[in-house]
Amino acid sequence: MVDTTAAAPAADHRSDRIVEWDAVELSDAIAQRAVSCVEVMGAYLDQIDRLNPQVNAIVNLRPRADLLDQALAKDQELAAGERRGWMHGFPHAVKDLANVAGFPTTQGFFRPPFNAPPASRDALAIERIRAAGAIFIGKTNVSEFGLGSHTYNNVFGTTVNAYDQTRSAGGSSGGAAVAVALRMLPVADGSDFFGSLRNPPGWNNVLGMRPSFGRVPGLNTDVFLQQFGVEGPIARSATDLAMLLQTMAGYDDRAPLSIEQDPGSYGQQLEADFAGGNVAWLGDLGGYLPMEPGVLELCERSFETFTELGIEVTDHPRLPTATSFAGNADLWPLFLIYRHWLMGSQLATIHRNPTMRAALKPEAIYEIDGLFTGADGNPPITALDVYNASVKRTSMHQAFRKLFSRFSLVALPSAQVFAFDAHLPWPATIDGVAMSSYHRWMEVTAIGTLLGYPVINLPVGFNDAGLPMGIQVIAPNHQDLTLLQLARAWEQRTGWVQRHRPALLG
Protein backbone atom coordinates (compact mmCIF):
# COMPACT_ATOMS: atom_id res chain seq x y z
CA MET A 1 0.00 0.00 0.00
CA VAL A 2 1.20 3.52 -0.83
CA ASP A 3 2.02 5.70 2.17
CA THR A 4 -0.37 8.67 2.17
CA THR A 5 0.59 10.22 5.49
CA ALA A 6 2.52 13.05 3.84
CA ALA A 7 -0.33 14.03 1.50
CA ALA A 8 -1.34 17.69 1.80
CA PRO A 9 -3.67 20.03 -0.10
CA ALA A 10 -0.84 22.33 -1.23
CA ALA A 11 0.89 20.87 -4.27
CA ASP A 12 4.67 21.11 -4.69
CA HIS A 13 6.28 22.62 -7.78
CA ARG A 14 6.62 19.28 -9.60
CA SER A 15 2.95 18.53 -8.95
CA ASP A 16 2.08 21.96 -10.31
CA ARG A 17 3.94 21.14 -13.51
CA ILE A 18 2.30 17.73 -13.88
CA VAL A 19 -1.25 19.08 -13.84
CA GLU A 20 -0.32 21.82 -16.34
CA TRP A 21 0.81 19.33 -18.98
CA ASP A 22 -1.53 18.67 -21.86
CA ALA A 23 -2.91 15.15 -21.79
CA VAL A 24 -0.68 14.04 -24.67
CA GLU A 25 2.40 15.41 -22.88
CA LEU A 26 1.31 13.60 -19.72
CA SER A 27 0.83 10.38 -21.67
CA ASP A 28 4.32 10.60 -23.16
CA ALA A 29 5.89 11.34 -19.76
CA ILE A 30 4.21 8.30 -18.20
CA ALA A 31 5.16 6.06 -21.13
CA GLN A 32 8.80 7.17 -20.92
CA ARG A 33 8.80 6.63 -17.14
CA ALA A 34 9.74 10.32 -16.67
CA VAL A 35 6.98 10.49 -14.09
CA SER A 36 5.26 7.69 -12.22
CA CYS A 37 1.54 7.01 -12.18
CA VAL A 38 1.66 7.44 -8.40
CA GLU A 39 3.18 10.92 -8.82
CA VAL A 40 0.52 11.80 -11.38
CA MET A 41 -2.31 10.59 -9.17
CA GLY A 42 -0.91 12.45 -6.18
CA ALA A 43 -0.55 15.67 -8.16
CA TYR A 44 -4.12 15.58 -9.41
CA LEU A 45 -5.54 14.64 -6.01
CA ASP A 46 -3.65 17.56 -4.49
CA GLN A 47 -5.14 19.85 -7.12
CA ILE A 48 -8.61 18.50 -6.38
CA ASP A 49 -8.11 18.94 -2.63
CA ARG A 50 -7.00 22.52 -3.21
CA LEU A 51 -9.61 23.70 -5.72
CA ASN A 52 -12.63 21.42 -5.77
CA PRO A 53 -14.07 22.73 -2.47
CA GLN A 54 -14.36 26.11 -4.19
CA VAL A 55 -16.19 24.89 -7.31
CA ASN A 56 -17.78 21.48 -6.56
CA ALA A 57 -16.94 19.99 -9.95
CA ILE A 58 -15.87 16.46 -8.91
CA VAL A 59 -18.20 14.38 -6.77
CA ASN A 60 -18.14 10.92 -5.22
CA LEU A 61 -14.33 11.00 -5.08
CA ARG A 62 -12.74 7.70 -4.10
CA PRO A 63 -10.38 7.55 -1.07
CA ARG A 64 -6.84 8.75 -1.77
CA ALA A 65 -5.23 5.55 -0.50
CA ASP A 66 -7.31 3.39 -2.84
CA LEU A 67 -6.50 5.56 -5.84
CA LEU A 68 -2.78 5.63 -5.09
CA ASP A 69 -2.83 1.85 -4.83
CA GLN A 70 -4.43 1.66 -8.27
CA ALA A 71 -1.79 4.04 -9.60
CA LEU A 72 0.96 1.86 -8.11
CA ALA A 73 -0.53 -1.12 -9.93
CA LYS A 74 -0.31 0.86 -13.18
CA ASP A 75 3.36 1.57 -12.48
CA GLN A 76 3.95 -2.12 -11.90
CA GLU A 77 2.32 -2.90 -15.25
CA LEU A 78 4.67 -0.44 -16.96
CA ALA A 79 7.64 -2.04 -15.21
CA ALA A 80 6.51 -5.37 -16.65
CA GLY A 81 6.30 -3.90 -20.14
CA GLU A 82 2.52 -3.55 -20.22
CA ARG A 83 0.99 -0.24 -21.26
CA ARG A 84 -2.76 -0.41 -21.70
CA GLY A 85 -3.12 2.68 -23.88
CA TRP A 86 -2.44 6.38 -24.17
CA MET A 87 -4.42 7.10 -20.95
CA HIS A 88 -2.41 4.62 -18.88
CA GLY A 89 -2.40 5.95 -15.32
CA PHE A 90 -4.62 8.97 -16.05
CA PRO A 91 -6.99 10.06 -13.26
CA HIS A 92 -10.44 10.27 -14.85
CA ALA A 93 -13.84 11.28 -13.47
CA VAL A 94 -16.89 10.31 -15.52
CA LYS A 95 -19.93 12.53 -16.03
CA ASP A 96 -22.54 11.39 -13.52
CA LEU A 97 -25.03 10.40 -16.21
CA ALA A 98 -22.85 7.52 -17.45
CA ASN A 99 -22.34 4.20 -15.71
CA VAL A 100 -18.97 3.22 -14.26
CA ALA A 101 -18.75 -0.26 -12.77
CA GLY A 102 -18.67 0.01 -8.98
CA PHE A 103 -19.93 3.62 -8.86
CA PRO A 104 -23.51 4.75 -8.34
CA THR A 105 -24.94 6.83 -11.18
CA THR A 106 -26.95 9.42 -9.28
CA GLN A 107 -27.88 11.58 -12.31
CA GLY A 108 -28.14 14.37 -9.77
CA PHE A 109 -31.34 12.83 -8.39
CA PHE A 110 -30.91 9.42 -6.80
CA ARG A 111 -30.26 9.89 -3.09
CA PRO A 112 -31.89 8.51 0.06
CA PRO A 113 -34.52 7.20 0.00
CA PHE A 114 -33.98 6.66 -3.75
CA ASN A 115 -30.44 5.33 -3.69
CA ALA A 116 -28.73 4.37 -6.92
CA PRO A 117 -26.92 1.03 -6.55
CA PRO A 118 -23.36 0.77 -7.90
CA ALA A 119 -23.39 0.11 -11.63
CA SER A 120 -22.59 -3.46 -12.63
CA ARG A 121 -20.80 -2.48 -15.85
CA ASP A 122 -19.35 0.49 -17.67
CA ALA A 123 -21.19 2.47 -20.30
CA LEU A 124 -19.86 1.65 -23.74
CA ALA A 125 -17.68 4.74 -24.19
CA ILE A 126 -16.46 4.38 -20.61
CA GLU A 127 -15.37 0.80 -21.36
CA ARG A 128 -13.07 2.27 -23.99
CA ILE A 129 -11.63 4.88 -21.65
CA ARG A 130 -10.93 2.14 -19.10
CA ALA A 131 -9.30 -0.01 -21.79
CA ALA A 132 -7.05 2.95 -22.66
CA GLY A 133 -5.63 2.77 -19.13
CA ALA A 134 -7.54 5.40 -17.14
CA ILE A 135 -8.16 5.12 -13.39
CA PHE A 136 -11.68 6.18 -12.40
CA ILE A 137 -11.42 8.48 -9.41
CA GLY A 138 -15.00 9.73 -9.12
CA LYS A 139 -17.72 11.48 -11.09
CA THR A 140 -18.23 14.99 -12.46
CA ASN A 141 -21.30 16.85 -11.31
CA VAL A 142 -24.40 17.31 -13.49
CA SER A 143 -27.76 18.98 -13.48
CA GLU A 144 -30.62 16.70 -12.40
CA PHE A 145 -31.05 14.09 -15.17
CA GLY A 146 -28.87 16.35 -17.33
CA LEU A 147 -31.74 18.82 -17.76
CA GLY A 148 -30.86 22.47 -18.21
CA SER A 149 -27.56 24.22 -18.72
CA HIS A 150 -26.89 25.00 -15.06
CA THR A 151 -25.20 22.28 -13.00
CA TYR A 152 -27.13 22.15 -9.75
CA ASN A 153 -28.94 19.30 -8.03
CA ASN A 154 -30.19 18.16 -4.64
CA VAL A 155 -27.59 15.40 -4.27
CA PHE A 156 -24.27 17.26 -4.54
CA GLY A 157 -25.28 20.91 -4.89
CA THR A 158 -24.13 23.52 -7.40
CA THR A 159 -21.00 23.57 -9.56
CA VAL A 160 -19.70 27.08 -10.15
CA ASN A 161 -17.67 28.68 -12.90
CA ALA A 162 -13.89 28.25 -13.13
CA TYR A 163 -13.47 31.97 -13.85
CA ASP A 164 -16.02 33.44 -11.42
CA GLN A 165 -17.24 31.38 -8.48
CA THR A 166 -20.42 33.45 -8.20
CA ARG A 167 -21.50 32.34 -11.68
CA SER A 168 -22.94 29.21 -13.28
CA ALA A 169 -20.62 26.62 -14.79
CA GLY A 170 -23.16 25.82 -17.48
CA GLY A 171 -24.51 22.32 -17.86
CA SER A 172 -25.16 19.61 -17.86
CA SER A 173 -21.43 18.87 -18.34
CA GLY A 174 -20.56 21.72 -15.98
CA GLY A 175 -18.53 19.58 -13.60
CA ALA A 176 -16.47 18.17 -16.47
CA ALA A 177 -15.73 21.55 -18.06
CA VAL A 178 -14.73 23.16 -14.75
CA ALA A 179 -12.54 20.20 -13.77
CA VAL A 180 -10.63 20.43 -17.07
CA ALA A 181 -10.32 24.22 -16.92
CA LEU A 182 -8.88 24.05 -13.38
CA ARG A 183 -6.45 21.23 -14.22
CA MET A 184 -8.21 18.79 -11.88
CA LEU A 185 -8.47 16.34 -14.80
CA PRO A 186 -6.30 15.94 -17.92
CA VAL A 187 -9.41 15.52 -20.12
CA ALA A 188 -13.07 14.74 -19.47
CA ASP A 189 -15.98 12.97 -21.09
CA GLY A 190 -19.32 14.73 -21.39
CA SER A 191 -22.61 14.36 -23.18
CA ASP A 192 -24.88 16.70 -25.12
CA PHE A 193 -28.60 16.66 -25.80
CA PHE A 194 -29.07 20.43 -25.82
CA GLY A 195 -25.71 22.15 -25.71
CA SER A 196 -23.98 20.33 -22.85
CA LEU A 197 -20.71 19.91 -24.76
CA ARG A 198 -20.92 23.48 -26.06
CA ASN A 199 -22.25 25.82 -23.37
CA PRO A 200 -20.11 24.64 -20.38
CA PRO A 201 -16.86 24.63 -22.42
CA GLY A 202 -17.79 28.06 -23.78
CA TRP A 203 -18.33 29.43 -20.28
CA ASN A 204 -15.11 27.88 -18.93
CA ASN A 205 -12.74 28.66 -21.82
CA VAL A 206 -12.03 25.09 -22.93
CA LEU A 207 -12.79 22.99 -26.00
CA GLY A 208 -15.82 20.76 -26.21
CA MET A 209 -17.17 18.71 -29.09
CA ARG A 210 -20.55 17.21 -29.85
CA PRO A 211 -19.64 14.52 -32.42
CA SER A 212 -21.83 13.39 -35.30
CA PHE A 213 -24.67 11.24 -34.04
CA GLY A 214 -23.39 7.65 -33.96
CA ARG A 215 -19.70 8.60 -33.83
CA VAL A 216 -19.55 7.61 -30.16
CA PRO A 217 -21.90 4.67 -29.63
CA GLY A 218 -24.22 4.82 -26.65
CA LEU A 219 -25.34 1.75 -24.73
CA ASN A 220 -28.78 3.07 -23.79
CA THR A 221 -31.95 1.19 -22.90
CA ASP A 222 -33.27 2.44 -26.26
CA VAL A 223 -30.72 2.33 -29.07
CA PHE A 224 -33.07 3.27 -31.92
CA LEU A 225 -35.32 6.24 -31.09
CA GLN A 226 -32.88 8.29 -29.00
CA GLN A 227 -30.95 10.15 -31.70
CA PHE A 228 -30.24 13.42 -29.92
CA GLY A 229 -28.09 12.80 -26.85
CA VAL A 230 -24.46 12.04 -27.73
CA GLU A 231 -21.25 11.57 -25.75
CA GLY A 232 -18.07 13.43 -26.54
CA PRO A 233 -14.81 14.97 -25.25
CA ILE A 234 -13.78 18.10 -23.33
CA ALA A 235 -10.13 19.20 -23.31
CA ARG A 236 -7.73 22.13 -23.16
CA SER A 237 -6.07 21.43 -26.52
CA ALA A 238 -7.21 20.24 -29.92
CA THR A 239 -4.84 17.28 -29.84
CA ASP A 240 -6.17 16.14 -26.47
CA LEU A 241 -9.73 16.57 -27.74
CA ALA A 242 -8.94 14.47 -30.80
CA MET A 243 -7.24 11.74 -28.77
CA LEU A 244 -10.17 11.36 -26.39
CA LEU A 245 -12.66 11.34 -29.25
CA GLN A 246 -10.78 8.62 -31.10
CA THR A 247 -10.75 6.62 -27.84
CA MET A 248 -14.51 6.94 -27.39
CA ALA A 249 -15.48 6.59 -31.07
CA GLY A 250 -15.96 3.59 -33.33
CA TYR A 251 -18.62 1.11 -34.33
CA ASP A 252 -20.06 -1.37 -31.85
CA ASP A 253 -22.77 -3.84 -32.81
CA ARG A 254 -24.50 -3.29 -29.48
CA ALA A 255 -25.31 0.18 -30.82
CA PRO A 256 -26.66 -0.56 -34.32
CA LEU A 257 -26.82 3.12 -35.37
CA SER A 258 -23.16 3.74 -34.56
CA ILE A 259 -20.99 4.83 -37.47
CA GLU A 260 -19.07 2.07 -39.26
CA GLN A 261 -16.05 4.29 -39.84
CA ASP A 262 -12.72 3.79 -38.15
CA PRO A 263 -11.88 6.93 -36.12
CA GLY A 264 -8.29 6.16 -37.01
CA SER A 265 -5.70 8.45 -35.51
CA TYR A 266 -7.43 11.82 -35.28
CA GLY A 267 -4.66 13.14 -33.07
CA GLN A 268 -2.09 12.69 -35.84
CA GLN A 269 -4.19 14.30 -38.61
CA LEU A 270 -4.77 17.78 -37.24
CA GLU A 271 -2.74 19.98 -39.56
CA ALA A 272 -4.90 21.38 -42.35
CA ASP A 273 -5.07 24.37 -44.68
CA PHE A 274 -8.40 26.21 -44.53
CA ALA A 275 -7.57 28.78 -47.21
CA GLY A 276 -10.50 29.19 -49.57
CA GLY A 277 -13.09 28.01 -47.06
CA ASN A 278 -16.15 29.97 -46.02
CA VAL A 279 -18.40 30.06 -42.97
CA ALA A 280 -22.03 31.11 -42.69
CA TRP A 281 -22.45 33.19 -39.53
CA LEU A 282 -26.04 32.71 -38.33
CA GLY A 283 -25.57 34.91 -35.26
CA ASP A 284 -28.94 35.60 -33.64
CA LEU A 285 -30.86 34.21 -36.63
CA GLY A 286 -31.72 37.62 -37.99
CA GLY A 287 -32.88 39.01 -34.66
CA TYR A 288 -35.00 35.98 -33.77
CA LEU A 289 -32.88 34.92 -30.78
CA PRO A 290 -32.56 37.42 -27.92
CA MET A 291 -28.94 37.89 -26.86
CA GLU A 292 -27.42 39.44 -23.76
CA PRO A 293 -25.66 42.67 -24.77
CA GLY A 294 -22.05 41.96 -25.62
CA VAL A 295 -22.45 38.33 -26.69
CA LEU A 296 -22.74 38.95 -30.43
CA GLU A 297 -20.08 41.65 -30.38
CA LEU A 298 -17.58 39.36 -28.66
CA CYS A 299 -18.36 36.41 -30.92
CA GLU A 300 -18.09 38.52 -34.05
CA ARG A 301 -14.56 39.52 -33.10
CA SER A 302 -13.71 35.94 -34.06
CA PHE A 303 -14.32 36.89 -37.70
CA GLU A 304 -10.75 38.18 -37.69
CA THR A 305 -9.45 34.73 -36.74
CA PHE A 306 -11.48 33.08 -39.50
CA THR A 307 -10.05 35.61 -41.95
CA GLU A 308 -6.48 34.95 -40.78
CA LEU A 309 -7.09 31.26 -41.49
CA GLY A 310 -8.24 32.05 -45.01
CA ILE A 311 -11.92 31.44 -44.24
CA GLU A 312 -14.37 33.99 -45.61
CA VAL A 313 -17.20 34.95 -43.23
CA THR A 314 -20.65 35.60 -44.66
CA ASP A 315 -23.52 36.97 -42.61
CA HIS A 316 -26.43 34.64 -43.26
CA PRO A 317 -28.91 35.70 -40.59
CA ARG A 318 -31.88 33.52 -41.47
CA LEU A 319 -32.20 29.78 -41.15
CA PRO A 320 -32.62 28.06 -44.50
CA THR A 321 -36.15 26.83 -45.14
CA ALA A 322 -37.56 23.87 -47.04
CA THR A 323 -40.90 22.30 -47.90
CA SER A 324 -41.89 21.32 -44.35
CA PHE A 325 -39.45 23.45 -42.34
CA ALA A 326 -40.27 27.13 -41.90
CA GLY A 327 -36.94 28.11 -40.35
CA ASN A 328 -37.09 30.22 -37.20
CA ALA A 329 -40.81 29.67 -36.68
CA ASP A 330 -40.40 25.90 -36.54
CA LEU A 331 -37.17 25.66 -34.56
CA TRP A 332 -38.42 25.79 -30.96
CA PRO A 333 -41.73 23.86 -31.43
CA LEU A 334 -39.82 21.14 -33.28
CA PHE A 335 -37.23 20.82 -30.54
CA LEU A 336 -39.87 20.80 -27.77
CA ILE A 337 -41.79 17.89 -29.28
CA TYR A 338 -38.69 15.70 -29.30
CA ARG A 339 -37.57 16.89 -25.88
CA HIS A 340 -40.94 16.25 -24.20
CA TRP A 341 -41.34 12.92 -25.95
CA LEU A 342 -37.92 11.54 -25.08
CA MET A 343 -37.31 13.02 -21.64
CA GLY A 344 -40.90 12.62 -20.50
CA SER A 345 -40.83 8.97 -21.57
CA GLN A 346 -37.51 8.32 -19.82
CA LEU A 347 -38.91 9.83 -16.63
CA ALA A 348 -42.30 8.10 -16.88
CA THR A 349 -41.52 5.63 -14.08
CA ILE A 350 -40.78 8.51 -11.74
CA HIS A 351 -43.93 10.26 -12.95
CA ARG A 352 -45.96 7.28 -11.76
CA ASN A 353 -44.35 7.30 -8.30
CA PRO A 354 -45.88 10.16 -6.26
CA THR A 355 -43.04 10.21 -3.73
CA MET A 356 -40.34 10.39 -6.39
CA ARG A 357 -42.27 12.92 -8.45
CA ALA A 358 -42.48 15.20 -5.43
CA ALA A 359 -38.66 15.16 -5.20
CA LEU A 360 -38.12 16.29 -8.79
CA LYS A 361 -36.89 19.75 -9.73
CA PRO A 362 -39.10 21.92 -11.98
CA GLU A 363 -37.04 21.12 -15.09
CA ALA A 364 -37.99 17.43 -15.01
CA ILE A 365 -41.62 18.15 -14.15
CA TYR A 366 -41.82 20.47 -17.15
CA GLU A 367 -40.73 17.69 -19.53
CA ILE A 368 -43.04 15.10 -17.95
CA ASP A 369 -46.00 17.45 -18.08
CA GLY A 370 -45.13 18.40 -21.65
CA LEU A 371 -45.58 14.79 -22.69
CA PHE A 372 -48.52 13.68 -20.57
CA THR A 373 -50.62 16.78 -19.83
CA GLY A 374 -49.16 19.58 -21.95
CA ALA A 375 -46.91 22.53 -21.13
CA ASP A 376 -46.90 26.23 -22.05
CA GLY A 377 -50.55 25.98 -23.08
CA ASN A 378 -49.81 23.22 -25.59
CA PRO A 379 -51.69 19.89 -25.61
CA PRO A 380 -49.99 16.59 -24.68
CA ILE A 381 -47.63 15.09 -27.24
CA THR A 382 -49.19 12.52 -29.57
CA ALA A 383 -47.72 9.92 -31.90
CA LEU A 384 -48.83 12.09 -34.83
CA ASP A 385 -46.90 15.03 -33.35
CA VAL A 386 -43.74 12.93 -33.28
CA TYR A 387 -44.25 11.76 -36.86
CA ASN A 388 -44.85 15.30 -38.11
CA ALA A 389 -41.78 16.47 -36.20
CA SER A 390 -39.71 13.83 -37.98
CA VAL A 391 -40.99 15.10 -41.34
CA LYS A 392 -40.00 18.66 -40.40
CA ARG A 393 -36.61 17.49 -39.15
CA THR A 394 -36.03 15.68 -42.45
CA SER A 395 -36.89 18.88 -44.29
CA MET A 396 -34.51 20.80 -42.01
CA HIS A 397 -31.73 18.38 -42.91
CA GLN A 398 -32.37 18.90 -46.62
CA ALA A 399 -32.28 22.67 -46.15
CA PHE A 400 -28.93 22.53 -44.35
CA ARG A 401 -27.56 20.05 -46.85
CA LYS A 402 -28.13 22.72 -49.50
CA LEU A 403 -26.61 25.37 -47.23
CA PHE A 404 -23.48 23.25 -46.89
CA SER A 405 -23.21 23.05 -50.66
CA ARG A 406 -22.45 26.79 -50.47
CA PHE A 407 -20.55 27.03 -47.19
CA SER A 408 -17.82 24.92 -45.59
CA LEU A 409 -19.02 25.63 -42.06
CA VAL A 410 -21.87 27.23 -40.10
CA ALA A 411 -21.32 29.16 -36.87
CA LEU A 412 -23.35 30.66 -34.01
CA PRO A 413 -22.65 31.77 -30.43
CA SER A 414 -22.34 28.89 -27.95
CA ALA A 415 -24.80 30.65 -25.61
CA GLN A 416 -27.23 33.56 -25.68
CA VAL A 417 -26.03 34.90 -22.32
CA PHE A 418 -22.82 35.06 -20.34
CA ALA A 419 -22.58 32.86 -17.24
CA PHE A 420 -25.34 34.00 -14.87
CA ASP A 421 -25.67 34.16 -11.08
CA ALA A 422 -25.19 30.62 -9.76
CA HIS A 423 -27.99 31.12 -7.23
CA LEU A 424 -30.56 31.44 -10.02
CA PRO A 425 -32.09 28.29 -11.57
CA TRP A 426 -32.00 29.84 -15.06
CA PRO A 427 -32.25 33.27 -16.73
CA ALA A 428 -35.84 34.52 -16.58
CA THR A 429 -35.25 37.10 -19.30
CA ILE A 430 -32.70 37.94 -21.98
CA ASP A 431 -32.39 41.59 -22.94
CA GLY A 432 -35.94 42.20 -21.73
CA VAL A 433 -37.45 39.14 -23.45
CA ALA A 434 -39.14 36.67 -21.06
CA MET A 435 -38.04 33.04 -21.34
CA SER A 436 -40.99 30.64 -21.55
CA SER A 437 -39.20 27.67 -20.01
CA TYR A 438 -36.12 26.58 -18.06
CA HIS A 439 -34.22 26.00 -21.31
CA ARG A 440 -35.57 28.51 -23.83
CA TRP A 441 -32.47 30.65 -23.20
CA MET A 442 -30.39 27.84 -24.76
CA GLU A 443 -32.30 27.77 -28.06
CA VAL A 444 -29.17 28.71 -29.99
CA THR A 445 -27.93 25.13 -29.48
CA ALA A 446 -31.08 23.50 -30.90
CA ILE A 447 -29.87 23.58 -34.51
CA GLY A 448 -26.87 21.33 -33.87
CA THR A 449 -28.97 18.94 -31.81
CA LEU A 450 -31.74 18.58 -34.39
CA LEU A 451 -29.33 18.14 -37.30
CA GLY A 452 -27.13 15.58 -35.55
CA TYR A 453 -24.08 16.99 -37.36
CA PRO A 454 -20.74 17.49 -35.55
CA VAL A 455 -20.43 20.74 -33.57
CA ILE A 456 -17.44 22.14 -31.70
CA ASN A 457 -17.10 24.94 -29.15
CA LEU A 458 -14.17 27.26 -29.81
CA PRO A 459 -13.18 29.92 -27.24
CA VAL A 460 -13.46 33.51 -28.48
CA GLY A 461 -12.43 35.55 -25.45
CA PHE A 462 -13.86 37.38 -22.47
CA ASN A 463 -16.23 40.24 -21.75
CA ASP A 464 -15.34 43.24 -19.58
CA ALA A 465 -16.35 41.27 -16.46
CA GLY A 466 -13.83 38.54 -17.30
CA LEU A 467 -16.44 35.95 -18.32
CA PRO A 468 -15.55 33.61 -21.21
CA MET A 469 -17.65 32.97 -24.30
CA GLY A 470 -17.38 30.56 -27.21
CA ILE A 471 -18.79 30.00 -30.66
CA GLN A 472 -20.22 26.73 -31.90
CA VAL A 473 -19.09 25.70 -35.36
CA ILE A 474 -21.09 23.10 -37.27
CA ALA A 475 -19.61 20.97 -40.06
CA PRO A 476 -21.40 18.77 -42.59
CA ASN A 477 -22.50 15.41 -41.29
CA HIS A 478 -19.66 13.04 -40.34
CA GLN A 479 -16.95 15.66 -40.96
CA ASP A 480 -15.78 15.50 -37.35
CA LEU A 481 -12.11 15.59 -38.34
CA THR A 482 -12.62 18.95 -40.07
CA LEU A 483 -13.72 20.49 -36.76
CA LEU A 484 -10.77 19.00 -34.90
CA GLN A 485 -8.44 20.44 -37.52
CA LEU A 486 -10.16 23.81 -37.20
CA ALA A 487 -9.70 23.68 -33.43
CA ARG A 488 -5.98 23.06 -33.91
CA ALA A 489 -5.62 25.99 -36.29
CA TRP A 490 -7.76 28.15 -33.98
CA GLU A 491 -5.65 27.52 -30.88
CA GLN A 492 -2.46 28.22 -32.81
CA ARG A 493 -3.87 31.61 -33.82
CA THR A 494 -5.56 32.63 -30.57
CA GLY A 495 -4.11 30.69 -27.63
CA TRP A 496 -7.18 31.55 -25.55
CA VAL A 497 -6.96 28.47 -23.33
CA GLN A 498 -3.22 28.58 -22.78
CA ARG A 499 -2.90 32.36 -22.31
CA HIS A 500 -5.97 33.03 -20.14
CA ARG A 501 -5.89 30.75 -17.11
CA PRO A 502 -8.50 30.93 -14.34
CA ALA A 503 -7.36 33.12 -11.44
CA LEU A 504 -7.92 30.21 -9.04
CA LEU A 505 -4.86 28.53 -10.54
CA GLY A 506 -2.67 31.33 -9.22
Features from the language model and the residues they span:
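Short, hinge-like loop/turn segments at secondary-structure boundaries
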Residues: N154-G157, N204-G208, I337-H340, T429-I430, ...
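Short, electropositive alpha-helical surface patch
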Residues: P468-L481
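Short Gly/Pro-enriched turn/cap motifs at secondary-structure boundaries
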Residues: E82, A116-P118, T166-G170, R198, ...
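Short, well-ordered beta-strand elements within core beta-sheets of diverse protein domains
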Residues: E25-Q32, P112-P117, G229-R236, D376-I381, ...
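Short glycine/serine-rich loop segments
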Residues: R121-D252, T449-F462, L467-G470
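Amidase signature
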Residues: M1-E82, T247-E443, L450, H478, ...
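Gly/Ser-rich catalytic/binding loops embedded in alpha/beta enzyme cores
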Residues: V2-F194, E304, L309, Q398, ...
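Short glycine-/acidic-enriched loop or helix-start segments at secondary-structure transitions
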Residues: F103-P104, G146-G148, N199, P290-M291, ...
